[in-house]
């Protein structure tokens, strides 16, 4: 079901709180639009608000009841939270495909369902990480994915709380500050035998004219090839993660994914708010078993740079040709889940999250006990992030305390 030729004019939510916020946002954005020339679409507002309220009420009423389990058995807490968070991750997929007609095409190598991997991908837009869920929902399990994100995002109400509970890895983009946190998080996943598929963007930022000019200046300074469709990768984090996961025996493969948008390219959240959803998203997958990767740091860096040279040529052929990856000689990958199963999950996701948020609003309105729980939980989410640095930091501390490990990586540093 596609909406390429149609514009959704109005989508009304059935709950009053969303209507009130929608009205306020519409007024505010219209005033802003007059100054900056930003066109706002109702379907963009609907998309953003639906995701926000789902993450907001989901964090409070689905994730927070299990917080005490963190202090008793962090591995059980992690197992449950991964699955709860995955229920929300199906919502953007469902909205993008079912309501906005986004088409996803995946070519290349097949995924091995449930395998532990590092996913490296070119960073064409700020939303690539979310669009990847459309791929993983069919070819893997959403509960396995972890993402490296900017630390500033963890304080965002709803979204940030859920990402903390999901144990995403928040970084400051300064390796001196990030290395220790990477060590602790990766070692924790290895110690509790938690399989993961860790998404990393070696380029560090999305492709824009400014980032491309900086990348090409770096290339000229170091005698490297200038790129048009990708940025030169930063390999320090990638090589560290691969080595650490390999040491912890928690890595089966590296998935090198090339993402491309043959028609419109929604560069940022602003474009989604305008209702500018991608008509098509193409993913080309290369799977490299871990035993085929170099073992030395220097060779692994060269390996990563070689993949980016290939991406540049692959994307050049894509955009200058027929705008698909069929020229590689590899056809569409058969998914590990049937389209009927995926469709059922998408419809159930829309139904569940459409009913869940207004139901929670109703409970807050009717019962003072729920209202107090709601308020106290928000206070806890805000204070714990400011005092301790986030739920994932508390989770690590609980694991260390219960297992008497002052530092998770001490055994590797001896």
Swiss-Prot record:
Sites of N6-acetyllysine modification: 221
Motif placement: HXXXXD motif: 123-128
Organism: Homo sapiens
Domain of life: Eukaryota
Result for mutant: residue 206 to R: Does not increase enzyme activity
InterPro entries listed in its UniProt record: Acyltransf_C, Plipid/glycerol_acylTrfase
Membrane topology annotation: Multi-pass membrane protein
Family according to the record: Belongs to the 1-acyl-sn-glycerol-3-phosphate acyltransferase family.
E.C. number(s) listed in UniProt: 2.3.1.-, 2.3.1.51
Protein location: Endoplasmic reticulum membrane
Protein name, UniProt field: Lysocardiolipin acyltransferase 1
GO molecular function term, any single one: 1-acylglycerol-3-phosphate O-acyltransferase activity
GO BP: any one term: CDP-diacylglycerol biosynthetic process
Cellular-component GO terms for this entry: cytosol; endomembrane system; endoplasmic reticulum; endoplasmic reticulum membrane; membrane
Free-text note on domains in this protein's UniProt record: The HXXXXD motif is essential for acyltransferase activity and may constitute the binding site for the phosphate moiety of the glycerol-3-phosphate.
Reported effect, residue 206 to C: Abolishes LPIAT and LPGAT activities
Swiss-Prot/TrEMBL catalytic activity: a 1-acyl-sn-glycero-3-phosphate + an acyl-CoA = a 1,2-diacyl-sn-glycero-3-phosphate + CoA; a 1-acyl-sn-glycero-3-phospho-(1D-myo-inositol) + an acyl-CoA = a 1,2-diacyl-sn-glycero-3-phospho-(1D-myo-inositol) + CoA; 1-acyl-sn-glycero-3-phospho-(1'-sn-glycerol) + an acyl-CoA = a 1,2-diacyl-sn-glycero-3-phospho-(1'-sn-glycerol) + CoA; 1-hexadecanoyl-sn-glycero-3-phosphate + (9Z)-octadecenoyl-CoA = 1-hexadecanoyl-2-(9Z-octadecenoyl)-sn-glycero-3-phosphate + CoA
């Amino acid at each position: 079901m596609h909406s390429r030729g149609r514009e959704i004019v109005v989508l009304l939510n059935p709950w009053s709180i969303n209507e009130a916020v929608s009205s306020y946002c519409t007024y505010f954005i219209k005033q802003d639009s007059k100054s900056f020339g930003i066109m706002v679409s109702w379907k963009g507002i609907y998309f953003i608000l639906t995701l926000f309220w789902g993450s907001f009420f989901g964090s409070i009423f689905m994730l927070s009841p299990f917080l005490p389990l963190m202090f008793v058995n962090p591995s059980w807490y992690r197992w449950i939270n991964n699955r709860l968070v995955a229920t929300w991750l199906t919502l953007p997929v469902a909205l993008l495909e079912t309501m906005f007609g986004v088409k996803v095409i995946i070519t290349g190598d097949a995924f091995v369902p449930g395998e532990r991997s590092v996913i490296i991908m070119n960073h064409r837009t700020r939303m690539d990480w979310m669009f990847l869920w459309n791929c993983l929902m069919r070819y893997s399990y959403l509960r396995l994915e972890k993402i490296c994100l900017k630390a500033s995002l963890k304080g965002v109400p709803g979204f940030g709380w859920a990402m903390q509970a999901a144990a995403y890895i928040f970084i400051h983009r300064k390796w001196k500050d990030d290395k220790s946190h990477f060590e602790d998080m990766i070692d924790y996943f290895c110690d509790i035998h938690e399989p993961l598929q860790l998404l990393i963007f070696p380029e560090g930022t999305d492709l824009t004219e400014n980032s491309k000019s900086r990348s090409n200046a770096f290339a000229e300074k170091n005698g490297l090839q200038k790129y048009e469709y990708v940025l030169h990768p930063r390999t320090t984090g990638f090589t560290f993660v691969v080595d650490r996961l390999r040491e912890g025996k928690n890595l089966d493969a590296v998935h090198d994914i090339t993402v491309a948008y043959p028609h419109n390219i929604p560069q940022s959240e602003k474009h989604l708010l305008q209702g500018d959803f991608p008509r098509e998203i193409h993913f080309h997958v290369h799977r490299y078993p871990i035993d085929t990767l170099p073992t030395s740091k220097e060779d692994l860096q060269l390996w990563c740079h070689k993949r980016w040279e290939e991406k540049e040529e692959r994307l050049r052929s894509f955009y200058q040709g027929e705008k698909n990856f069929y020229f590689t000689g590899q056809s569409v990958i058969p998914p590990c889940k049937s389209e009927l199963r995926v469709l059922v999950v998408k419809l159930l996701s829309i139904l569940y999250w459409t009913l869940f948020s207004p139901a929670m609003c109703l409970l807050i309105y009717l019962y003072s006990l729920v209202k107090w729980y709601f308020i106290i939980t928000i206070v806890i989410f805000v204070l714990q992030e400011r005092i301790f640095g986030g739920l994932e930091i508390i989770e690590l501390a609980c694991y260390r305390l219960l297992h008497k490990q002052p530092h998770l990586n001490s055994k590797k540093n001896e």
